């Protein structure tokens, strides 16, 4: 995902991982020590109330890295109480200057940058993504996100309003309160930053549940939050499982807002829980089946490489992956041939190796699910052009896979696979492809490749998606909002828009003896 990766353009992958590109990347420790595996509440580390733990697994080997405290409802209750206490009127956090909140966020970014090599290695160990990507892409964007929101801390404010009569009226942007945040496993550090940045910049307090597959880096950042000087209770982090810890956050009567990134299926559950409890505010960044439209006048070399990047980046584990590649019929055969050749050349292997482009899938569940989709694609008549099998004798590695002759009604064209499986579909006209691209329950992202500005403008307006890229893919910046249409979610993250979900707007109107202009 992401701008830091996309700016390397066609050099991404093995060209990004060339000797010249990796000179600035420190050598990783392939067995980084785990320092934080408990529950973080009130700037202190705790075992779970139940004393239960769960294993976190290295997806490259299937071996257990360590045991992690398994948070449950009782632990969430403790975390919410700590957060609520930190949010009381007159508390150090509530009385803190907004500019000081910004300095704390900048300090946190500085500490993450100090420990960047360690965090990148730990992310690769726990998640499986290539270390070079962890270091150059994920950590780079974490730092930019936190520093961007640090700058907003004392600049997001209300305004005076000239209402009629002898009155003075103004608005205040006040923090929502206790914010439950549930982050996914595909970008653990980055999604943590996307959630923490706007919440803390606007003065909220946080109870965060980290994904059970990848808890280690987000927990280590908790240590840095304390070191940065955030008061106790402002950020609390609970590792655990969705049906227990996650559900406890979503249904908690003293949580004022919940932000979730993950599957549409779980997003539905969270929205129902929020509504049936205290009607807490909800923002959801959910699944996608994003159309990537290649017009016949597109730059072929660029379009092939970007379509490859759009699907295969992060082992295909991106909510906004370009997972429906629509190619105009007069260039279809050449595009397919080149895409297959590119997929066959993709380097799959040890994610700590600087030559590796693709590591393992995050866990056995995802591994089996993706292989199941590949089998379904073959059974339903899609043409398997390359890959389709297991890529290693241990770990959760899958061969880069390309299907051609994919039809809109096939399962692999409708459902989110979340793996290294490219589906290429043929179209004739621009009107046809708009209808087919929009014929989806999802609407997270889309892309268009063309040299014709009129076509680009028409398609970018016609496509039902929260983000449309033109002649590029996966270009992100902390300044630009991201979120979905339809069943891809509600609300926006990043940019100034990302602050709106974390504030209440209060109107204050004062009677004055006489109003003058």
UniProtKB/Swiss-Prot annotation:
- Describe its PTM? In response to mitochondrial stress, the precursor protein is ubiquitinated by the SIFI complex in the cytoplasm before mitochondrial import, leading to its degradation. Within the SIFI complex, UBR4 initiates ubiquitin chain that are further elongated or branched by KCMF1.
> Looking at the keywords, is Acetylation present?
yes
Class in the EC hierarchy, top level: oxidoreductase
A biological process term (GO) from this entry: regulation of dopamine biosynthetic process
Q: Name one Pfam family in it.
A: Aldedh
Reactions this protein catalyses: an aldehyde + NAD(+) + H2O = a carboxylate + NADH + 2 H(+)
What is the name listed in the Swiss-Prot or TrEMBL entry for this protein?
Answer: Aldehyde dehydrogenase, mitochondrial
Concerning InterPro entries, the annotation shows: Ald_DH/histidinol_DH, Ald_DH_C, Ald_DH_CS_CYS, Ald_DH_CS_GLU, Ald_DH_N, Aldehyde_DH_dom
Give me the Gene Ontology terms describing cellular component: mitochondrial matrix; mitochondrion
Q: What is the lineage of its organism?
A: Eukaryota, Metazoa, Chordata, Craniata, Vertebrata
Q: Which family does it belong to?
A: Belongs to the aldehyde dehydrogenase family.
GO MF terms listed in the record are: aldehyde dehydrogenase (NAD+) activity; carboxylesterase activity; phenylacetaldehyde dehydrogenase (NAD+) activity
Q: What does this protein do?
A: Required for clearance of cellular formaldehyde, a cytotoxic and carcinogenic metabolite that induces DNA damage.
């Amino acid at each position: 995902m992401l701008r830091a990766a996309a700016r390397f353009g066609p050099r991404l992958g093995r060209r990004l991982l060339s000797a010249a590109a990796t000179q600035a990347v420190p050598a990783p420790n392939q067995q980084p020590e785990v320092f934080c595996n408990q529950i973080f509440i009130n700037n202190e580390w705790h075992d779970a109330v139940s004393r239960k733990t769960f294993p976190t697994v290295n997806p490259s080997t299937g071996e257990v890295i360590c045991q992690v405290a398994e948070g449950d409802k009782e632990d969430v209750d403790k975390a919410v109480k700590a957060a609520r206490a930190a949010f009381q009127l007159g508390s150090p956090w509530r009385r803190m200057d907004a500019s000081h909140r910004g300095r704390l966020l900048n300090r946190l970014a500085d500490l993450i940058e100090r420990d960047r090599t360690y965090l990148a290695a730990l992310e690769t160990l726990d998640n499986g993504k290539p270390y070079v990507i962890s270091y150059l892409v994920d950590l780079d964007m974490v730092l930019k996100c936190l520093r961007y929101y640090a700058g907003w801390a004392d600049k997001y404010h209300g305004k005076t309003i000239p209402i009629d009569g002898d009155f003075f009226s103004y608005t205040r942007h006040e923090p929502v309160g206790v914010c439950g945040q549930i982050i996914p496993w595909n970008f653990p550090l980055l999604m943590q930053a996307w959630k923490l940045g706007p919440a803390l910049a606007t003065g909220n307090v946080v109870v965060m549940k980290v994904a059970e597959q990848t808890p280690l880096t987000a927990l280590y950042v908790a240590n840095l939050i304390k070191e940065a000087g955030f008061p106790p209770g402002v950020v609390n982090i609970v590792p655990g499982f969705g049906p227990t810890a996650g559900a406890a956050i979503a249904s908690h009567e003293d949580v004022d807002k919940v932000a979730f990134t993950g599957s549409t299926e779980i997003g539905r559950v969270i929205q129902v829980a929020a509504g049936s409890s205290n009607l807490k505010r909800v923002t959801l960044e959910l699944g996608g089946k994003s159309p990537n439209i290649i017009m016949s006048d597109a730059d072929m070399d660029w379009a092939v490489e970007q379509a490859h990047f759009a699907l295969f980046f992060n082992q295909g584990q991106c909510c906004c992956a370009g997972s429906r590649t629509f190619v105009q019929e007069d260039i279809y055969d050449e595009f397919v041939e080149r895409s297959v050749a590119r997929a066959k050349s993709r380097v799959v292997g040890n994610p700590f190796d600087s030559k590796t482009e693709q590591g393992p899938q995050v866990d056995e569940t995802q591994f089996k699910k993706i292989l199941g989709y590949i089998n379904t694609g073959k059974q339903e008549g899609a043409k398997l052009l390359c890959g389709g099998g297991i890529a290693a004798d241990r770990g959760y590695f899958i061969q880069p896979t390309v299907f051609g002759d994919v039809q809109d009604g096939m399962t692999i064209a409708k459902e989110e696979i979340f793996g290294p499986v490219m589906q290429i579909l043929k179209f004739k006209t621009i009107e046809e492809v708009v209808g087919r691209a929009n014929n989806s329950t999802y609407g997270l992202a889309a892309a268009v490749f063309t040299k014709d500005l009129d076509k680009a403008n028409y398609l970018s307006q016609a496509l039902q998606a929260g983000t449309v890229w033109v002649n590029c893919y996966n270009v992100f910046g902390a300044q630009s909002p991201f979120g979905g249409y339809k069943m891809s979610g509600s609300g926006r993250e990043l940019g100034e828009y990302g602050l709106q979900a974390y504030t209440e707007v209060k109107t204050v109107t004062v009677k004055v003896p006489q109003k003058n202009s």
